[in-house]
Amino acid sequence: MGGLFSRWRAKPSTVEVLENIDKEIQALEEFREKNQRLQKLWVGRLIIYSSILYLFTCLIVYLWYLPDEFTARLVMTLPFFAFPLIIWTLRTVLIFFFSKRTERNNEALDDLKSQKKKILEEVMEKETYKTAKLILERFDPDSKKAKEFEPPSAGAAVTAKPGQEIRQRTAAQRNLSPAPASSSQGPPPQGPVSPGPAKDASAPGGPPERTVAPALPRRLGSPATSVPGMGLHPPGPPLARPILPRERGALDRIVEYLVGDGPQNRYALICQQCFSHNGMALKEEFEYIAFRCAYCFFLNPARKTRPQAPRLPEFSFEKRQAVEGSSSTGPTLLESVPSAESQLIEDSLEEQDVLDNSTEQRDDKIPVTEQTSQVIEKTSGPEEPAENQEETENEETSTNEAKSPVLRADSVPNLEPSEESLVTK
């Protein structure tokens, strides 16, 4: 009766078959994970519990049940030598048991995957495009991901970037624009190609490009022809500032820490137009440095102008020598003149003091001398000529001393015109 009813039952569709296969595959994968967890659990528990039991039994036997005789001790310790071997064999048995279960599980899983693959191939051959696409998206998403990550073939066209499309279009227009003019006027004469640098052509929305003139004519469609827009970007001018290496050793880090230099003590030079990194500058030079971008060639001005010191006056060597000579001779003359004048004035003042003192003493001595002369005249008459001679000598000396300062004082102003003449000269 079951065979009769089975004839009238509807045949399951491919979608139902694939669903059942997916369920079985999922169950087998779960069982494999569960089996691996159980294997680790049982093996770990066996080792832990057996080691704890082994240590406790060894301790108990050593403290209470260890006999004194050597043969009895040997018989008592034999089970302790056999116990690790027993544990190791149990561990291998458990690993073998779980590994066999995983092998059977993997075999069943491989069979289901092969069945699923065959059914999907039949779907791609027999079913329509729409149903086949739906079935593949539902039951075989890995193939779609693999197609997305496949590299493009060599014959496929290379997708250009947004900025590159403009460059290719402008380059193609430059190459195709002189074609009709040359066809009407005939082939132009081919002159020698100058080996100098090519001219720069500015492309809209990008840095200046160099038009590369081909040295030899090539056939259209040959494999050696270069794609327009590829390799036209100039290398750019060399950077005047050093760029720190990315990989630095321990010695470099120590030196940078001691000197106070390094990436952590520098400021990045970012272009204002394309926001690209153009090296690093020191903290003292960051605000005063102006640089040209190495990628878009934009000149980034300095944030501040460096303060300049005031300009010193210019002196020639001959003028400097003349000024030094005049400054060296002038003060010596001026210093010598006042020194001579001061000495003369001091001498004259001292002499005047001496004269005043001498005149006062002479005035005081005059009455004394008169009285003494009278006494002497009374007492001794023949001694008068000697005393008169002494008086006359004293008077002459005093008069000579009075005349000498007057002469010296008169000689002082005679020196003044000579000093003035020296100054004027």
Swiss-Prot record:
InterPro entries: Lnp, Lunapark_Znf. Residues 144-242, 320-425 are annotated as: Disordered. Residues 384-398 have a biased composition (Acidic residues). A lipid is attached at residue 2 (N-myristoyl glycine). Myristoylated; myristoylation is necessary for the endoplasmic reticulum (ER) three-way ER tubular junction formation, but is not required neither for membrane translocation, membrane topology formation, nor for the specific localization to ER membranes. Phosphorylated. Phosphorylation occurs at Ser-177, Ser-182, Ser-222, Ser-316 and Ser-380 during interphase. Phosphorylation occurs at Ser-114, Ser-153, Ser-194, Thr-211 and Ser-348 during mitosis; these phosphorylations reduce both its homodimerization and the ER three-way tubular junction formation. Residues 186-195 have a biased composition (Pro residues). Residues 2-45, 99-425 are cytoplasmic. Residues 67-77 are lumenal. GO terms for biological process: blood coagulation; embryonic digit morphogenesis; embryonic forelimb morphogenesis; endoplasmic reticulum tubular network maintenance; positive regulation of endoplasmic reticulum tubular network organization; regulation of chondrocyte differentiation. Its main location: endoplasmic reticulum. Homodimer; homodimerization requires the C4-type zinc finger motif and decreases during mitosis in a phosphorylation-dependent manner. PANTHER family: ENDOPLASMIC RETICULUM JUNCTION FORMATION PROTEIN LUNAPARK. This is Endoplasmic reticulum junction formation protein lunapark. It comes from Mus musculus.
